[in-house]
């Protein structure tokens, strides 16, 4: 008989600062040793459920609760945070916010030190988990100096060392390149099997989590559970698309191909589908002529070092007017440093040519009138309280006449679909709307190139689509779009050129479909093929042709 380890019974929760409950009538039992994925759009209540589990609610965020919530048969909110920490361990989305020690070894030992563990036992457990998670060579290093994947392993070791029976992962893939994300999912699965932990994963990237099996998926929206069952059962419904969650790419492609999936019972794993070689025939469409584009911004021999360590190595890059470019590569490849160089945030060696004119001497303000740099988190860019004032800020700092400011701000707000909100406080906006405000604040300065760092990281399908369709509109109006991204599907769907960076060098300049069909290049860049590649192998068709077919269908084109 299965043993219940976590139980919510008709459970509701309302934050002190809100009138309506965030969780409503939750009935959910998690059994010992299960591995459960919790999905839902932004604001659905899934993070609140996790915060109830790990004690952030009610110890940090207060509110009113109704119904029952039990952990191992005990009333959860009656437990001390200390007792709960020995039952539930959490790996946060922001690993840097979780580090305590000055070295990896100190960080791993932190929980044991708090428990006054004997020194010999402490050393033994630190060594055990460092060895298990391949951290032995890193024990003397600062956690902050590690790659994204290494940081995740240190965070995981830091909670595993306490040997809690319940592990909670809060969006573990949000800041990782594709290969590092895959490695973490494999590691979570390995720990789950070897240690027998009860594992809960809160994550938007459903297909990436399903790289390894889960027992159940719980879909939450508007504070209620809409689905609680197996991955195969969920994928057979329309609930994912109805609730703003991206379905696996191979399923989308199969539907485009006209394959009947109604009788398929194991949709969660491509290998288990009954489709076979020769079932689908692709016709190659004649290659479309690409109009010649003019050079807009050219970088020549650009190099940059930090503490005598080369970060950018003699880069050559020609950004042409009207392009949509994705910059990809593993964590630490130099992508963000390149963005800072393009934006004149750092001083580098090399030449910068704007329409063949040397602009290396640009100040940050002058470069911002050519290239607008949009950070991943809009809250880090916003400086004022009101929408109009935020968009007007750059013009006011430049001493522009107030009458002209009003004209230019109103025009930009109309372009960005924000004119009706011009007198609103920014705090009243959604994440996607805030993103528009930050883009408006750079467009108003006249920027031709919009440079975005992870434009959709951590966003559900609704916000993802809203942001990317807005960027498509700006592209249609003549803007050049450059995006740094870890999202291979975003790269495929929304770019026509991809730059691949490895260790500060551009090792490839190609089109998305070609990159995703080149296993050797993907390995070099710590990326991974999309499930279209694996689907192509199963159907015995050319991966490049199938990827091109998907992209054309997505853009509304039909093969002859």
UniProtKB/Swiss-Prot annotation:
Give the UniProt family note. Answer: Belongs to the ABC transporter superfamily.
Q: Name one GO molecular function term.
A: ATPase-coupled transmembrane transporter activity
Against PROSITE patterns, the record matches this protein to: ABC_TRANSPORTER_1, ABC_TRANSPORTER_2
Q: What's a single GO CC term here?
A: ATP-binding cassette (ABC) transporter complex
Q: Which UniProt keywords apply?
A: ATP-binding, Cell membrane, Membrane, Nucleotide-binding, Repeat, Translocase, Transport
Q: Where does this protein chiefly localize?
A: membrane
Q: How does it sit in the membrane?
A: Peripheral membrane protein
Any idea where this protein resides?
Cell membrane
Positions binding ATP 2 in this chain are 329-336
All copies of domain ABC transporter, residue ranges: 6-247, 297-528
Note the Gene3D superfamilies from the entry: P-loop containing nucleotide triphosphate hydrolases
Its EC number is 7.-.-.-
Q: What does this protein do?
A: Probably part of an ABC transporter complex. Responsible for energy coupling to the transport system.
UniProt source species: Streptococcus pneumoniae serotype 4 (strain ATCC BAA-334 / TIGR4)
- Report residues binding ATP 1: 40-47
Q: What class of enzyme is it?
A: translocase
Which taxonomic lineage does the organism of this UniProt entry have? Bacteria, Bacillati, Bacillota, Bacilli, Lactobacillales
Task: Output this protein's name.
Answer: Putative ABC transporter ATP-binding protein SP_0483
Superkingdom of this entry's organism? Bacteria
- InterPro entries recorded for this chain? AAA+_ATPase, ABC_Co_transporter, ABC_transporter-like_ATP-bd, ABC_transporter-like_CS, ABC_transpr_CbiO/EcfA_su, ECF_ABC_transporter_ATP-bd, P-loop_NTPase
């Amino acid at each position: 008989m299965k043993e219940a380890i976590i139980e919510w019974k008709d459970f509701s929760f309302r934050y002190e600062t809100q009138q309506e409950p965030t969780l409503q009538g939750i009935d959910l039992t998690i059994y010992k040793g299960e591995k459960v994925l919790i999905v839902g759009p932004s604001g659905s209540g899934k993070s609140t459920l996790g915060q109830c589990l790990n004690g952030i609610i009610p110890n940090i965020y207060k509110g009113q609760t109704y119904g029952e919530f039990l952990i191992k048969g005990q009333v959860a909110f009656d437990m001390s945070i200390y007792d709960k920490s020995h039952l539930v361990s959490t790996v946060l989305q922001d690993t840097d916010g979780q580090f305590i020690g000055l070295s990896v070894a100190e960080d791993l030992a932190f929980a044991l030190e708090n428990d006054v563990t004997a020194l010999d036992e402490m050393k033994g457990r630190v060594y055990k988990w460092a060895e298990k998670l391949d951290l032995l060579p890193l024990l003397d290093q600062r956690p902050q100096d590690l790659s994204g994947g290494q940081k995740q392993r240190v965070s995981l070791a830091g909670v595993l060392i306490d040997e809690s029976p319940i592990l909670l992962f809060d969006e573990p893939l949000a800041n990782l390149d594709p290969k590092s994300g895959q490695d973490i999912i494999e590691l979570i699965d390995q720990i789950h099997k070897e240690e027998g932990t009860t594992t809960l994963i809160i994550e938007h990237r459903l297909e990436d989590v399903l790289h390894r099996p889960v027992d159940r998926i719980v879909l939450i929206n508007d504070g209620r559970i809409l689905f609680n069952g197996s991955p195969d059962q969920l994928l057979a419904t329309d609930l994912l698309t109805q609730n703003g969650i991206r379905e696996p790419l191979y399923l989308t492609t199969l539907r485009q191909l006209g394959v009947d999936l109604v009788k398929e019972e194991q949709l969660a794993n491509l290998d288990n589908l009954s489709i076979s070689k020769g079932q689908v025939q692709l016709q190659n469409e004649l290659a479309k002529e690409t109009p010649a584009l003019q050079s807009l911004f050219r970088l020549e021999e650009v190099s940059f070092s930090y503490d005598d360590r080369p970060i950018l190595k003699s880069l050559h890059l020609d950004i042409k007017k009207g392009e949509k470019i994705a910059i990809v590569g593993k964590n630490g490849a130099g992508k963000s440093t390149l963005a800072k160089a393009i934006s004149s945030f750092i001083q580098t060696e090399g030449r910068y040519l704007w329409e063949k004119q040397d602009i290396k001497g640009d100040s940050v303000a002058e470069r911002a009138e050519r290239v607008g740099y949009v950070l991943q988190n809009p809250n880090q860019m916003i400086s004022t309280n009101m929408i109009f004032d935020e968009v007007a800020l750059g013009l006011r700092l430049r001493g522009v006449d107030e009458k002209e400011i009003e004209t230019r701000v109103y025009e930009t707000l109309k372009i960005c679909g924000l004119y009706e909100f011009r007198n609103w406080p920014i705090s009243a906006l959604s994440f996607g709307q805030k993103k528009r405000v930050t883009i408006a604040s750079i467009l108003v300065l006249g920027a031709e190139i919009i440079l975005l760092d992870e434009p959709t990281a951590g966003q559900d399908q609704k916000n993802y689509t809203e942001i990317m369709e807005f960027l498509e509109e700006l592209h249609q109006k003549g803007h050049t779009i450059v995006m740094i991204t870890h999202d291979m599907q975003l790269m495929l769907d929304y770019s026509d050129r991809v730059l691949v960076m490895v260790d500060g060098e551009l090792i490839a300049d190609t089109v998305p479909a070609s990159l995703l069909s080149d296993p050797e290049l993907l390995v070099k860049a710590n990326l991974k093929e999309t499930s279209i590649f694996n689907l192509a192998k199963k159907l015995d068709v050319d991966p490049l042709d199938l990827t091109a077919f998907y992209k054309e269908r997505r853009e509304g084109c039909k093969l002859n």
